[in-house]
Structures are given as structure tokens and as C-alpha cells.
Amino acid sequence: MRNLGVWIEIGGLQTYVGRIIGEKEEDARFSYAEEYLSGNIARPISIHLPLSANAFSVDDTRNFFEGLLPEGFTRRCVAGLLHTDANNYLSLLAGLGNECLGAIKITDENNEVVNADYQKLTIDEVSQLAREGAMETAELVTKSHLSLTGASGKVGLYYDENNKDWYLPKGSAPSTHIVKQSHVRLDGIVTNEQLCMMTAGNMGIEIPESFIVNVGDGRDEEVLLATKRYDRAIKDGLKKINGLSVPYRLHQEDFSQAMGISAHNKYESDNAGYLKMMFEIIRQKSFNPIADQLKMWDICIFNYLIGNTDNHIKNVSLLYDEELKTVRLAPAYDILSTVIYTSSTRDMAFSIGNEYDIKKITRDSFRREAANIGLGEQMAMKRFDYLANAFPDALNKACDELLGKGFNKAIDIYERIRDRRREFIS
């Protein structure tokens, strides 16, 4: 029998929410605790898991909580280290749930309690992280009991900005940055993502702070991408561990979780209408629905312009305030040009104007999609034209900034993006 406690941080305090109970993952169901429901701070932990005294279905339970876990090779590696099956999401949650994306924490009474702490990393250890593969990263993730979604090799670390030192969180200690490795099959991916994120920022799209950590001469095996977590915040007067201010957690959920869709179905098929569903959630739930619809539309356009076909529904999220009272569209993240790699698909993760193939998507496709999702045509196409016209200069500026910092790989990525755009975008 699995009996996992579910907690969420509200206003900086860990609050018991409920439990996931089941003999195995095939019958595990989440339910809110009676004391949580009767309290004056009760808030849903997901749009798809509204406050209810009834236990949620097996599928609804799995779709939300499995969405907190790593995917792909990293997940298989972590499962091996935890001596469990990669499909056993309950065991993975029990092993990694101390520090998840957002403000959720998972506890297992059978696990030894690990005190919250920060372990300072030496320069050599940071360098080793850059040079090691996904298996070694999975070991670090397992040791820190930290769960980050996605399939790439990444780990949550604490960055002391004043002293430029990195720390590995232990137990329930929150991280401040998500740190990604290069990818053995996708050359220049760290520079690629940083270039794309900077380009988006130059065009007025909200992005989290990020920077390249160079532990050598800037080669792929010597760089890491550090992204400041928008779901963590540091305020004056916070608790300290070893002299370090402990950030408080802000809750978030990706659109796969908010829509109640399994992570296995994060890529749309058969014109299922994912984008329309996302816009409907924004209209109904955002505290500023007009602004967030425009932000979402800008992100869709930018993914097309930059050639990001990995724009699935787990790569867009909703961010809650610290009291879980309001929700808004989170900053854009995980944006890179996938089309510069020959192994990538040309199909976007969801259709635009009933088209998936990026080579077949046109300005008119966006006009049709605007009508489909309920955006005014004049406003929607004005944004499209503005971003399309601003894109070349924004990309060039981002490239120059990276070159100025000594990241010479940027010019190669820039030229490949430019050349692929000429092929795909008429």
C-alpha cells in the first residue's frame, strides 16, 4: 500500500493538503484532507483538481502528479538508482518529491527524513557537472531528492549571487536555479537556448533570467545553462540555512496538468485543439486574461519564428501568487530552435490554423488560428506583423551580446537559424 502525503507552500508555510493512496499506481487516487478543505486557506492545487471531498480518479491523479517527474532517459536512470520501475510514478514521487517544480512537496512515511541543507560545490564539481552525462546528473537528482520535469539533463541548484557560489540543496531545501547540461546529440544546445531566450526578451516577451556558466573554453562539454526559477523568490527576513536566505516557493502547473492531459500526450494529434483549450483556461482563470492571452499569442508566434517545434503543453505554465489566490501565465521557458538539428521534426507540437508542418504554416495560418481561439483578427495579426518584423534585429542583437561575452558558438547557431528560416518561412 502506498500512502504519500501531499503538501503545498502557502505564504511561505508548508501546508498539508491531502494524500495519494493505493495498492499500486493502477489504483492510486488523490484526495484532499478534510482538515484542509475546512480551513480558511484551502485552495486547489490544480485547475483540474478543484476542491472536493471526493477522491479523484486514477487518471486525474496520475496526470497531475506524474507531471512533476522527469521524463525520458533521466527518468529511467533515476528509476534504476531508486531500484524501481520507470513506470512506477508513486515510487519516483516518494524518492524525488522533497523539491518539485512549483510549491508541491511529497512525503513518504517510510523514507528517512533528510534535513534541509545546502552543500557548497567546488569549481571542480561544477566543471564535472558540465562534462558528465545524463546518468551522472540523474545520480545528483536522486541524491538531492529533487524532481524537475523534462527529458534533458538538468538539476536544481542554489546560486549565491553575491559570492558567485553554487550549492546542492539537500532534503527539502529549495533551489534557486535550474541548471542544464549540453546534449551529446544536439550540438550547441546551451548556446542555442540562451540565444533564443535573449532574442525573445529583446522582443518584449517575458522570460526568466538566464546565463551561460562557462567552466572552460566555451566548448559544449564546458558550458551549462543556468535559469533563475520564477517559482522561487527571496525576500528580506527569510529563514537562513548556513547563512543563505531560503527562498519561498510559488506554485505553478504546466498546461498538461491544468488540462488534465497525460504527459505522454503532450504533443497534439488529430487537431485536438490544444491551443484553443489553453486560451480558454487563460480566459477563465487568469487574473489578467486580456494581457495573458496576448502574451500566449506572442509566445506562439515566437516559437514559429525561431523554429521551435518542441513547443508542447508541458513547456507553457501557469504561475500562482504566494497565497494561491490568483494565477497568471508564467514567463516563457525551454525555447530553442529545434529545426536547426536534422534529427528534429518539422511538425509543431500543436496545430496552427490546422497545420502542423512548420514549412506549411503561413501568416494566413495564424489568421485562421486567431479566429479559432477567439482572438480579434486585427489585433492578432498586428502582433504577428510586429514580431515578424522585429525578429531579425532581435536575433542579431542577442548574437552580438553573446559574442561580446566570448561565446563564439553563437554565430554558428545564428547562421543556422537564419538559414532554416529562409527555408521554412517565405
Where in the sequence are the language-model features?
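Phosphate/dinucleotide-binding and metal-coordinating scaffold of catalytic cores
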Residues: 1-313, 317-426
